[in-house]
Amino acid sequence: MSGGKYVDSEGHLYTVPIREQGNIYKPNNKAMADELSEKQVYDAHTKEIDLVNRDPKHLNDDVVKIDFEDVIAEPEGTHSFDGIWKASFTTFTVTKYWFYRLLSALFGIPMALIWGIYFAILSFLHIWAVVPCIKSFLIEIQCISRVYSIYVHTVCDPLFEAVGKIFSNVRINLQKEI
């Protein structure tokens, strides 16, 4: 920790928590505090974002990386005037650039709010509803699986073994008649 910031193994900077004293991440218990000092706790809300590389995980490499050449192409022998081609390129590129910026300015923050709420609800439901339901189901099904296992071993196994012995002596001979 230097200069009031944490640096993780990937080089990301995190600011020091606002409340140093009484912070829930820094217990007052000396043994726990010493143990915790070996592990740095990061505050995800204060990490700095990269304004140059805005897609570090390459989510949109295959989807929205559209340039003029990807959309408009003139085959050999069918070319417009060079000036028209250059003006079309400039018009396409500038329009795409500024219209994206306009849409981002108008709808970026509301969409971020909507997606933030959506993923918060999704996380909440997963943590507080889905996982407990699955755990409860697994606990309840474990009891049923024991009863089912006893049923299979006491009823089904002898029945199918007997049927198998009955049909084990059945022989079929196929002859081809000419």
From Swiss-Prot:
Chain positions covered by the region annotation Interacts with SPRY1, SPRY2, SPRY3 and SPRY4: 131-142, 167-178
Modified residues annotated as Phosphotyrosine in this record: Y6, Y14, Y25
PTM sites of type N-acetylserine: S2
Region listing for Interaction with CAVIN3, in residue ranges: 82-94
Region (Required for homooligomerization): 2-94
Gene Ontology BP term (one): negative regulation of potassium ion transmembrane transport
Residue(s) carrying Phosphoserine: S2, S9, S37
Sequence ranges on the Cytoplasmic membrane side: 2-104, 126-178
Span list, region Interacts with SPRY1, SPRY2, and SPRY4: 149-160
Assembly: Homooligomer. Interacts with GLIPR2. Interacts with NOSTRIN. Interacts with SNAP25 and STX1A. Interacts (via the N-terminus) with DPP4; the interaction is direct. Interacts with CTNNB1, CDH1 and JUP. Interacts with PACSIN2; this interaction induces membrane tubulation. Interacts with SLC7A9. Interacts with BMX and BTK. Interacts with TGFBR1. Interacts with CAVIN3 (via leucine-zipper domain) in a cholesterol-sensitive manner. Interacts with CAVIN1. Interacts with EHD2 in a cholesterol-dependent manner.
Record's protein name: Caveolin-1
Natural source organism: Homo sapiens (Human)
Classification lineage: Eukaryota, Metazoa, Chordata, Craniata, Vertebrata
